[in-house]
Swiss-Prot record:
Required for maturation of urease via the functional incorporation of the urease nickel metallocenter. Residues 1-11 have a biased composition (Basic residues). UreH, UreF and UreG form a complex that acts as a GTP-hydrolysis-dependent molecular chaperone, activating the urease apoprotein by helping to assemble the nickel containing metallocenter of UreC. The UreE protein probably delivers the nickel. Belongs to the UreF family. Transmembrane segments: none annotated. It comes from the Bacteria. The keyword Transport does not apply. Keywords: Chaperone, Cytoplasm, Nickel insertion. This is Urease accessory protein UreF.
Length: 256
């Protein structure tokens, strides 16, 4: 091997900007990404998130979450463990892989998530939400998602909400930190709504919980940006157990 040639080649590759997904900017000239990211994270975006508690219902029925204080502790624990290392991290990784046009890497990330998710209800929930997110975007004919997103949509077998959202955000050149912030808030808001309905809590308590989570939100986003693929799916065993126990609850309001 020519050592001089090898060093020269390496220097060229260092510092190169990531590829940008090829989208027809003119086709989306009428789309305001600021409003679009609000739309896809809104509770009325029809992917069925409201039908899942992801194990929370078990905590409530077992009297582990009974009031505002225990609901807040549950949320902090869940957000800083399973949600961080699976949802937030996979969103970031698929976002970065989309910028690199690396479809194989994205499919590999989704396979790791599927194989690492022990509870059956959580696996099914991930797939349903991911598929529904993709199909809803495709049904919006005025929105040109670009060739890479379309190739991903046709190829993926095990999409999750977070991974498909990461591909979506990168395909439309949205800022990663903004995509993470909106996703984190929207999913936490869903959890709080579930607590308000099921514990139950007052609407005011729900808003107090969301307000008190602002500082942890910023910490979670910064932590996500620091993590790499080796941390993917560092799950909470306790939450997996509760999700499995949910399958045999006598009465259930949620599918997971």
């Amino acid at each position: 091997m020519d050592k001089g040639k090898s060093v020269k080649s390496t220097k060229k590759s260092v510092g190169m900007p990531p590829k940008t997904p090829k989208t027809d900017n003119n086709a989306n000239s009428h789309v305001d990404n600021e409003f679009l990211i609000l739309q896809v994270n809104d509770a009325v975006f029809p992917i069925g998130s409201y039908t899942h508690s992801f194990g929370l219902e078990t905590y409530i029925q077992q009297k582990k979450v009974t009031n505002k204080e225990s609901a807040l502790e549950y949320l902090k624990a869940n957000l800083s463990s399973q949600f961080l290392y699976t949802e937030m991290l996979s969103l970031k990784l698929t976002y970065e892989s989309t910028l690199q046009q690396d479809l194989k890497k994205i499919l590999g990330i989704e396979e790791v998530i599927m194989l690492s998710t022990s509870p059956m209800e959580l696996r099914l929930a991930n797939q349903k939400l991911g598929n529904r997110f993709i199909k809803t975007l495709q049904a919006m004919n005025e929105l040109d998602m670009g060739a890479f997103f379309n190739a991903y949509a046709q190829t993926t077998k095990d999409p999750t909400h977070a991974t498909s959202y990461g591909v979506f955000a990168a395909s439309l050149n949205m800022e990663l930190k903004k995509a993470l912030r909106h996703y984190l808030y929207a999913q936490t808001s869903n959890m709080v709504i579930n607590c308000v309905k099921s514990v139950p809590l007052s609407q005011n308590d729900g808003q107090k919980i969301l307000l008190s989570l602002q500082s942890p939100f910023n910490q979670l986003i910064e932590k996500t940006l620091e993590l790499d693929e080796s941390h993917l799916c560092a799950a909470s065993v306790q939450n997996d157990i509760k999700a499995m126990q949910h399958e045999s609850l006598y009465s259930r309001l949620y599918m997971s």
